[in-house]
Amino acid sequence: MSNGQLIYLMVAIAVILVLAYVVAIFLRKRNEGRLEALEERKEELYNLPVNDEVEAVKNMHLIGQSQVAFREWNQKWVDLSLNSFADIENNLFEAEGYNHSFRFLKASHQIDQIESQITLIEEDIAAIRNALADLEKQESKNSGRVLHALDLFEELQHRVAENSEQYGQALDEIEKQLENIQSEFSQFVTLNSSGDPVEAAVILDNTENHILALSHIVDRVPALVTTLSTELPDQLQDLEAGYRKLIDANYHFVETDIEARFHLLYEAFKKNQENIRQLELDNAEYENGQAQEEINALYDIFTREIAAQKVVENLLATLPTYLQHMKENNTLLGEDIARLNKTYLLPETAASHVRRIQTELESFEAAIVEVTSNQEEPTQAYSVLEENLEDLQTQLKDIEDEQISVSERLTQIEKDDINARQKANVYVNRLHTIKRYMEKRNLPGIPQTFLKLFFTASNNTEDLMVELEQKMINIESVTRVLEIATNDMEALETETYNIVQYATLTEQLLQYSNRYRSFDERIQEAFNEALDIFEKEFDYHASFDKISQALEVAEPGVTNRFVTSYEKTRETIRF
C-alpha cells in the first residue's frame, strides 16, 4: 500500500469515527430528554392530591354499597402508590444506565415501556379521582334528585285525592302503590343520610320509575273506568230497551241467542272490573274493546231488521202491481200468438213458453198473497222476508225479460213478412232491368255463367213469392229462401257488370290493335284468337286477356289506360 492510500484510509476512518461519535451524542441527548420528560410526568402524578381526596371521602364514614365502592378504589390507589411508582422509578434508573453505557436500543425500548406504564397509571388515577368525586358528590346529587321526585309524587297524590271517584275499583291498588312509594322515600332518606348514597341512588332510581309508571296508570284508568262503568252499560241498556220494543212490534230475528248475549255482556262487565281493580289495564282495555264490538254487532242486527222491514213494506206494495202488469203482458202475448197463428206457422215453443210463464206467474201470485196475509202477525225475520221477496222480484224481472224477448220475436215475424214481400218485388224488377241492360249491349252472345245465375235467381225469387202466397206462411222458410235469393241477386249483378266491362274493353282493344296488326304478326295472331273467342265462345274475359297480353308487349301500360278510362265512364244499371 502506498503512502497516499494509507493517508486516505486513515482520513476515512477518522471521518467514520467522528460521525459515529456525533450520532452517539445525538441519541444520548434525545434519550436524556425523553427520560427527563417521563420523570416530570411521574412527579406530577405522584404530587396529585389523591391522598387528600381519599381522606376526605374516608371521613364521610360511608356504609353499605358506598363503603364497598370506596374500599375498592382506595385499594387500587394503594397499589399504585406503593408498587407502580416504585416500578417506574427502577425502570427510569435502568434506562439511564443503558443510555450512559451507549446501549441506545435497549434504552429506547425501556423508555417506551415506561411511557406505557405512566399512561396506564394516568388513566387509573383519573378513574380513581372520578370515582372518589362521585362518592363525595353522590349525597348532594341525591338531595337534588329527590326534591324533583317528591314534587312528582306530591302532584300524583294530589291528583288521586281530588279525583278519587274517577278511579273506581282501581283506587285501592293505586293508594297501595302510593304507600309503597312513600316507603321507598323513607328508605332513601335513611340510606342517604346514614352514609350510603350509592345504595340510596339505586333506591331513588327505582322510586322515580315507580312514580312514572303509576302516573301512566293514573292517566289511563279514568277513561277505562268511564267506558266500563258508564258508556258500555248505557249502550247495552239502550240496546235491551230497543230489543223489547222490536219484540213488542212483532219483529223476529234470525239469531236466537240475543238474550244470552245480553247476559254474557253483563258478566263480562263484572269480570273486567277485576282487571281494573288489579290495574291490569291492557287486559281491561282489550275486554272493553271486545264488549264494544259485541254491542256493535247486536246494534247491526237490530238496524238490519228495521231497514229490512221498510224494504219489505215497499216490496209488498209494489210486487202485486208488478205481477199484475206481467199477467196483462202475458195475456197480450197469448192474443198475439192466437192472431199470428191464423196467418203464420208458428213454432210450438212460442205458445208453450207463454203457458209456462203463466204457470210461474200464478205460483208467484200465491207466494205474494201468502206473505201479504201474514204481515199482521209475521212469523219470520224481516231480513229473511226481504231476501225472499227480493229473490221473487229478481225472478219476476227474469220473466219480464222473457216476455220482452217473446214479444220481440212475434213482432219480428210480421216485420220479416213485410220485408220479404218488398224484397220479392224489388228482385222481380231487378231481373227485368238486368235483362234489358244486357240486351242493350248488343253482345254476340250471352255467356252460360250469366244465364245460369239469371235463371237461378229468377227461380229462387219465384220460390220466395210462392212461400209468401201460402195460406199459412212459414216465416222461417221465407227467411231462408229470401237469404238465398238475396245472395243470387248480388252474384248476378256482379256477373252482369263483369261481362259488360270485359266485352266493352275487348272491343276497344281489338280496335286499338289495328295500328299494330299490319306489321306485328304476334298481335295479328292474338287479334284473330281473341275475336274468335269473342264471337263464338262468348268468353269475354278470356278474349280480353288474350288481346291485352299481346298489346302489353308492344305498348306496356295500354291496358290500364283503357281500364281506367272505362271505370270513369261506366254505365250503371238503373233499377
Swiss-Prot record:
Q: Which UniProt keywords apply?
A: Cell cycle, Cell division, Cell membrane, Coiled coil, Membrane, Septation, Transmembrane, Transmembrane helix
- Compartments (UniProt record): Cell membrane
The residue ranges crossing the membrane are 9-27
UniProt topological domain (Extracellular) ranges: 1-8
Instruction: Report one GO cellular component.
Output: plasma membrane
Q: Which domain of life is it from?
A: Bacteria
Residues on the membrane's Cytoplasmic side span 28-575
Membrane topology summary? Single-pass membrane protein
Biological process, per Gene Ontology: division septum assembly; septin ring assembly
Primary location:
membrane
* InterPro entries per the UniProt record, alphabetical: EzrA (IPR010379)
Q: Which Pfam families match?
A: EzrA
Name the coiled-coil region(s): 105-191, 265-301, 354-416, 456-526
The entry's family comment says:
Belongs to the EzrA family.
Q: What does this protein do?
A: Negative regulator of FtsZ ring formation; modulates the frequency and position of FtsZ ring formation. Inhibits FtsZ ring formation at polar sites. Interacts either with FtsZ or with one of its binding partners to promote depolymerization.
Q: Which NCBIfam families match?
A: PRK04778.1-4 (NF003410)
Report what the protein is called.
Septation ring formation regulator EzrA
Write down the species: Streptococcus pneumoniae serotype 2 (strain D39 / NCTC 7466)
Question: What gene name is listed for this protein?
Answer: ezrA
